Amino acid sequence: MGRKKGLPEFEESAPDGFDPENPYKDPVAMVEMREHIVREKWIQIEKAKILREKVKWCYRVEGVNHYQKCRHLVQQYLDSTRGVGWGKDHRPISLHGPKPEAVEAE
């Protein structure tokens, strides 16, 4: 018995049969959807924690030049923390969502 090579396969999509208009229609799908949302939030939170550790390390290593050298990591961290956390689902997206991408004119 050895370890299987490759990455494990996970169900990453929302559950089938969930109706957002009538969530109580299928209780099993409602619970699966709730678990899916919680799982996705935990993934976002853990990604933000990893980026925060990278920013700390970059600040420590770069010293006085951290404003220039760590800017990209800080931007990634700030983008990853927008909308992450509990209770932000019902707030307007403009307050916590990702910033809209600036489209360059041709």
UniProtKB/Swiss-Prot annotation:
Residues 1-25 are annotated as: Disordered. Keywords: Electron transport, Membrane, Mitochondrion, Mitochondrion inner membrane, Respiratory chain, Transport. It is found in: Mitochondrion inner membrane. The keyword DNA damage does not apply. InterPro entries: NADH_UbQ_OxRdtase_su10, NDUFB10. It holds the Pfam family NDUFB10. It comes from the Eukaryota. GO terms for biological process: photorespiration. Transmembrane segments: none annotated. GO terms for cellular component: cytosol; mitochondrial inner membrane; mitochondrial membrane; mitochondrion; respiratory chain complex I. Signal peptide: none annotated. The keyword Metal-binding does not apply. It is a peripheral membrane protein. PANTHER family: NADH DEHYDROGENASE [UBIQUINONE] 1 BETA SUBCOMPLEX SUBUNIT 10, NADH-UBIQUINONE OXIDOREDUCTASE PDSW SUBUNIT. Accessory subunit of the mitochondrial membrane respiratory chain NADH dehydrogenase (Complex I), that is believed not to be involved in catalysis. Complex I functions in the transfer of electrons from NADH to the respiratory chain. The immediate electron acceptor for the enzyme is believed to be ubiquinone. Belongs to the complex I NDUFB10 subunit family. Complex I is composed of at least 49 different subunits. This is NADH dehydrogenase [ubiquinone] 1 beta subcomplex subunit 10-B.
